[in-house]
């Protein structure tokens, strides 16, 4: 009788993923700092990208392993209606925490734009962007990326409505394919933009704020594209139903969050920040 389940909640077994995820994130972030600052740790030559890439591979491994466990839990009936509501609330809180990350980047950019010499400086006049910084024309590549990301959001909404309201797997799969392709295109164009930038990460406070804000968003686009791709594979395998598709719903929420953040980036950094 000890193994009889008489409640709607999920009792999780011990998992290795939080521990290894923390290690991967620590190595990745430490490697990123070492790479950007060109420093060494205990005499080890980690100033290149290798430590960062090792941590990134570890984080991706944990991501897919953890997702696989969650998928298996859903297929074995562990995700009751109560559990699904908890997963949805948890993901909403996760997105709220991500919002605060971007608030910090926007705060840094706007504060330095309004007070280039610092809020406590007796010199009130300053130049923004700093002298020597050649900014991007927002009406060329940034505008194209904006349209691409908005179209991908439309594709995700189209796919979600087709699946939830009509149960149309074919339309849902087509919509997700379009969204994933557009997500990859956005990332490629962002990389192209970076490669042709007239300033580097360490050039000025403008450059640092620009790359941190847009780069952090770019990382979210990559994660969101992977998220949508996983949903696409699961749909092709028949692992989602109209009643049980929490993963798909979370991916759609995440992608729309990425869309909204980019609109703010486009207006604040590319247009107003010029």
Swiss-Prot record:
Q: Determine the domain of life of the protein's source.
A: Bacteria
Q: Which residues lie on this side of the membrane: Cytoplasmic?
A: 2-15, 78-79, 167-168, 238-244
Transmembrane regions listed in the UniProt entry: 16-36, 49-77, 80-115, 140-166, 169-197, 204-237, 245-274
Tell me what reaction this enzyme catalyses: 4 Fe(II)-[cytochrome c] + O2 + 8 H(+)(in) = 4 Fe(III)-[cytochrome c] + 2 H2O + 4 H(+)(out)
One Pfam family per UniProt: COX3
Q: Does the keyword Signal apply?
A: no
Recorded GO MF terms: cytochrome-c oxidase activity
UniProt cross-references to SUPFAM superfamilies, sorted A to Z: Cytochrome c oxidase subunit III-like
Assigned EC number: 7.1.1.9
State the top-level EC class: translocase
Q: Where does this protein reside within or beyond the cell? A: Cell inner membrane
Membrane topology, as annotated, equals: Multi-pass membrane protein
Q: Which UniProt keywords apply?
A: Cell inner membrane, Cell membrane, Membrane, Translocase, Transmembrane, Transmembrane helix
Topology: which residues are Periplasmic?
Answer: 37-48, 116-139, 198-203
Chief localisation class: membrane
Q: Which GO terms describe its cellular component?
A: plasma membrane
Question: Family assignment?
Answer: Belongs to the cytochrome c oxidase subunit 3 family.
- Indicate what this protein is called per its UniProt record: Cytochrome c oxidase subunit 3
């Amino acid at each position: 009788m000890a193994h009889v389940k008489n409640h709607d909640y999920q009792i999780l077994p011990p998992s290795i993923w939080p521990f290894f995820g923390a290690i991967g994130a620590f190595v990745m972030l430490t490697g990123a700092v070492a790479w950007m600052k060109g420093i060494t740790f205990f005499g080890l030559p980690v100033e290149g990208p290798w430590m960062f890439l090792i941590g990134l591979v570890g984080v991706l491994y944990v991501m897919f392993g953890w997702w696989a466990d969650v998928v298996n839990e859903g297929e074995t009936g562990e995700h009751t209606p109560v559990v699904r509501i908890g997963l949805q609330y948890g993901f909403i809180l996760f997105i709220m925490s991500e919002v605060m990350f971007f608030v910090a980047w926007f705060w840094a950019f706007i504060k330095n734009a309004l007070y280039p010499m610092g809020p406590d400086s007796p010199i009130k006049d300053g130049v923004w962007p700093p002298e020597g910084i050649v900014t991007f024309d927002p009406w060329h590549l940034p505008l194209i990326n904006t349209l691409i990301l908005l179209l991908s959001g439309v594709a995700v909404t189209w796919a979600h409505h087709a699946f939830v309201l009509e149960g149309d797997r074919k339309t849902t799969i087509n919509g997700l394919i379009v969204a994933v392709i557009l997500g990859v295109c956005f990332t490629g164009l962002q990389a192209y933009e970076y490669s042709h930038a007239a300033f580097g990460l360490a050039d000025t406070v403008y450059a640092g704020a620009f790359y941190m804000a847009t780069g952090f968003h770019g990382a979210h686009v990559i994660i969101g594209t992977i998220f949508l791709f996983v949903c696409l594979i699961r749909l092709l395998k028949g692992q989602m139903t109209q009643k049980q598709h929490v993963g798909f719903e979370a991916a759609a929420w995440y992608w729309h969050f990425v869309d909204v953040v980019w609109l703010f980036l486009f207006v604040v950094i590319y247009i107003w920040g010029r």
